[in-house]
Amino acid sequence: MKNRFFLIPGALGLGFLILFGIFTSERQDLVLDGKGTTVFFDFNDDAVNSETTICGNMCNGIEKNTSFVQGITGSAVKFEAQNESWLTVPHHPSLSFGEEGGVTIVFSVKVDTHSYKHNMIYNKGNVGWGHFYTPSYDGLYEGEYLAFQAIWTGDDVQEYVNVMCNDGKEIELNKWYFVAHVLEPDHKTLKQYINGIEMCSSTSEKPLNTDSLDDLNLGHVEGTYNDFSQLTLDNFTIFNYSLTADEISTLYQKLS
């Protein structure tokens, strides 16, 4: 089954960014600067692409074995590892993890189980990973601590950031968390916010090159790990610039 998402183009310098999903009237102000430089999945509507855009049908989202359940605001998408469910958006030059102004990725997530060691939330090749993670691959220390983590890489070993905020507390099951990853305009520092509060950051030796020809995947990573997830995701949003701490707090208040 293929679900197509409504697309609206937005200009940013020489590039373009697109808007996925249909904003409900009470949430129009999610685009904080009004420039339309946002990619947004609200999962409320299985909408077809009814607009003529720079990328046309090439930017339709493709849903694979997912289900839709009650979310924070309307529907949310549920990924189940046993069904190998995920959502992919084919690559297009208009889809980016940031230009000169940085990038912000925010989402609400509810984890169903601690048994999966690499619960991928989003992935775009080697550029950007965000997942729910237990650090022991051999299983010897499973459950010691679990955390949200983001790993972003560039073209060489000096382009690397890794944020995992370990406060000694396990992520609670079946509880919604609001997570934000903010790459600063210099493309060197990545910050992680949990429920509107900055928790930790990581700084790269060199600015990250965030260009990637890979598809954007939600709930799955293809390649070496080929992992699937066991979680529920709502309001997945990409801003093609760096949000401030106050703007992150505002989004958290609106989407909680």
Task: Provide a role label for each language-model segment.
Residues 1-12:
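N-terminal Sec-pathway targeting helices
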Residues 92-95, 166-170, 205-206:
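Beta-strand-rich interaction surfaces with strong enrichment in secreted/lumenal proteins
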Residues 150-178:
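Short, aromatic/His-centered strand-loop micro-motif at the edge of beta-sheets
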Residues 175-183, 192:
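Short tryptophan-centered beta-strand motifs in secreted/extracellular beta-sheet-rich domains
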